[in-house]
Amino acid sequence: MKRVFSIKGIPVIAAVALLMLTACGIDAPVDDPDNQEPDDKEEVRTGIQSFTNPADGRVITPSGETITCVVFTDAAYAAELVIHSGESDWAKLNKGATGEKGRNNIRIVFEENETEEERKAELMLEVDGYERTSLAVFTQNPSGKTAAMEQNMHLNGYMHDILLEDYLWADEYAKLEVDLTIDYTRFLDTYLMSMGDVNIEDGGLYRANSANPGQRFIYSNIQELTGTKAIETGGLGFGPIFASQITESGLMGLSIAYVHQGSPAYAAGMKRGDTIFKVDGVTLTSSNYQSYMTQLYYSPSGTYTFDFVRDADLETAYTAEVTAGSYIYNPVLYSAVLTEGAHKIGYLVLENFDLNCQEFITDIVDQLASNAITDLILDLRFNPGGAVAQSRYLTSAIAGTAHLDDTFVKVTFRDGKTQDWKFRGGPNDQDGLGIAPDLGLDRLYVIGSYGTASASELVINSLKGIDFPVYIYGGRTEGKNVGMTTTQTSYKGRTYLFSPITFRVANAKGFGDYPDGFPADVVVNNQNDSYADDKDNLFPYSFGDWGSMGFNVALRYAYEDIIGVSHSNAPATRSASFEPIPFGHTGLKQPQQGRFGNIIYLPASQR
C-alpha cells in the first residue's frame, strides 16, 4: 500500500447503502517445466503455472452467467472455447483469447439456455512452446420445465416434510395449500410469510433506518453449500460496505465495515473505515457506484486496484492492489487490551459463533485470561449469531467457574420437550468444547446493534438470568429469541442446508420474551429514520479503525464508564487507542459445522 496524491477540502456526507462482498478462488496445481527432470511423462508439460476457475465443481446456471478465470503461463498463449453441444455461439470468450507471459484474465460469457438439452463447452489453451491442453469443461443445465420442476419438487418437498413435523408453528403451517413446483428459493418466503402474525417470531419487520423499513422478513432459510471446508473461504476479505457521497459534486465512496484477518485485503494493508473512491482507475459517482458494488459482490476472482482515503482524512489518499483468493476464515475481527490505571480493559470484536473456528475462540479467550484483564468490552454489533455451544463457551468464561452449574439456556421444542444447558456445557453438561478459563469478571460491557441477534443475544440473556451485570452500548439488538435445527439434503451432487425455526430459548429465570431485542443502556444510534438525533449517525459503521476511540463512539463511551469519567458528545481528542494483542493461534482441526447467522442447534439425529 502506498500514498498516491491528495484530495483537499472535501466534506463528508451520510451513509446510504450496504452490500456484502463475497468471492471465491480455487488453487490449481503448479506445473513448472524448469524444475522437472525429463521422463516418460513429458506430455504433461503445459507451460501453465496455475489456473483458477470460479465455476469449478458446479454447472453453469440455465439463465446464463459471466465468469472470469485467471491463468499464469510461462509464455504467450492462445485460448479457444470448443463447443461440444448446443448452438455454436452459446458460450464465447469475451476477454483473454490471447495473452502474454504471466497473469491473464479469461472471461467467458454463457448465454441463457432456452432449450431442453444440456450443453457443454471446453476451454483449451496452448502456451507457446508447449502442447495444447484442456483447462476446463463447462456444463450448462437445460432450462426446460422438467429439470427445474424436478429440482424444485425435491427441495420443496424436503422442506415441506420437515416443516410439517418440526416447525415451531407446524400446526398452522399444515393448513396451507402449497405448490411444490415453485422456485425453491421462493418457497419459504411465499408460504411462511403468508401465515401473518402467527409466526411473526420467525423473522419480523425491518427497522426504520433500514433499506426496507416495515417490510417482513423471515429467518428460516435454505442455502446451497459450496464447499466441504467452511473454515476456508475466498474473496477479497471485506465485510459489509456502505456507500456515501463524499463530495457535493457527486463523488461516491464505498466504506469498509471491516476486513477479515488474514484475507487478501488485510495483507494489502486495508482496514476498517477505509473509503474507496476509485476502482481500477475509475472514479465512483452516483451513476456508477452501484454497478461497482455489484461487481465486487459477484466477482469470484480477479485483481483490483483501489484508491481510498482513511480515517476521514481527505487530504491524503492511498492505493492498494488486492487479488481475491482463499484464506482461513477468522471470526475474530479485532482483539486488544488497553491498560488505564488499575484497569486492564479487553476489547473483543466477534463476527459470529462458528464451530469451525472454535480454536480461534479458545485461543483469544486464553490470551485474555493470560493478560489478566479486569474488564471486557464485547463488540457484537455485526454478530448475527451461530452455534449455541460456542456462545455457551465464551459466556462461561465471562460468568466464571462459580456459575458452571447454573442454567445457561433452556430450549423448548414444538412438541414441548425441553433441554437445559448449563454454563458447564450441554445438553447433559457436554457439548464437546470443554470449560473455558475464568476471566475473573464481575460485569460485561456489550456493544450491540440491530445486527446483534440469536446466539449473540444468548450471551446477554443468559447473564441476566444469573444476575450478572450487563451494560449495552450502541443500539437495540435484533430480538431473535427462537432458534433452528439444521439438516442437509443432496440433489444431483449438490448439497443444500435447511434451517427452519424449531425451538424457543429462555434463561435461568425463564425469561425469553425479547422479540423486540434488548435496548441499549447508552444509545449511540436509535435506529429511527433520522440521523439528526444520533450521537453517531454511522453506527454500527465507522470511518475509522476498531481501536480508534475518536471514531468508535460506542467503544469510547464504554471505556469512559469503566475508568469513571463523564461522556463527551464531541469527537474524542484522546490520542491513545486500543492496540491489537498478538494472535497466537497455530493450528486448526477438521471442521465440525457450517457457519450460519442464527441460533444453531444440533440436528435431530445428533441430539
Describe these PLM feature segments.
Residues 277-373:
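C-terminal, low-ordered peptide segments at domain boundaries
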Residues 343, 347-348, 358-363, 367-375, ...:
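C-terminal "post-core" interaction segments
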Residues 231-278, 282-285, 354-360:
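PDZ/PDZ-like domain segments forming the peptide/carboxylate-binding groove
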Residues 47, 74-107:
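Surface-exposed binding patches on compact interaction domains or structured appendages
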Residues 2-4, 13-53, 129-153:
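Bacterial Sec-dependent N-terminal signal peptides
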Residues 42-83:
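Solvent-exposed, low-complexity, repeat-rich "mucin-like" stalks and linkers
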